């Protein structure tokens, strides 16, 4: 899923959210190419100051972990090609930022995403709601995240974006 959230003057708003329609029957390389094109199109359209992704953990399902890892690499490469800094958050960090507890369930997260973004109903499908939650998490943690990223040698653009407190910040989460 993907979500685009803007922060302006302490208020949050959803600009876009959904899931990428990837051809299930196509070969892996075609699906990954379609994902790259989708991410590139979102980044070109919304020109986000950052891209945030969720760290996912898979116990014993190696195939799922590999597929998600490949998709994550494509997302990071698409952002890197456009010089958009990337940040990563654990599911617990996302839940804590959105709901106030890292133990929140999926329904709580969806309801809080709707409330924080002033949406009439929780976003659907679930993957879109999750992506919007990751973007909210990033916006809530931005000053800290940028300081950590800058210390680690991240592009100066990330630091500059954090200083633009009066202008709108657009974040894409995948």
Predicted segments with their positions:
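Phosphate- and other anionic-substrate recognition elements at nucleic-acid/protein interfaces
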Residues: 1-174
């Amino acid at each position: 899923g993907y979500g685009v959230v803007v922060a302006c003057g302490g208020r949050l708003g959803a600009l876009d959210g959904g899931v990428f329609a990837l051809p299930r029957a196509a070969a892996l390389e075609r699906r990954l190419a379609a994902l790259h094109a989708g991410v590139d199109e979102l980044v070109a359209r919304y020109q986000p100051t950052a891209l945030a992704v969720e760290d996912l953990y898979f116990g014993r399902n190696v195939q799922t972990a590999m597929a998600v890892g490949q998709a994550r690499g494509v997302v990071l490469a698409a952002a890197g090609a456009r010089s958009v800094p990337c940040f990563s958050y654990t599911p617990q960090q996302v839940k804590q930022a959105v709901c106030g507890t890292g133990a929140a369930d999926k329904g709580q997260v969806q309801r809080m995403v709707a409330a924080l973004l002033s949406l009439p109903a929780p976003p659907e499908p679930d993957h879109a709601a999750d992506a919007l939650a990751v973007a909210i998490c990033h916006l809530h943690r931005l000053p800290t995240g940028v300081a950590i990223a800058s210390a680690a040698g991240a592009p100066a653009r990330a630091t500059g974006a954090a200083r633009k407190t009066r202008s709108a910040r657009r974040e894409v989460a995948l």
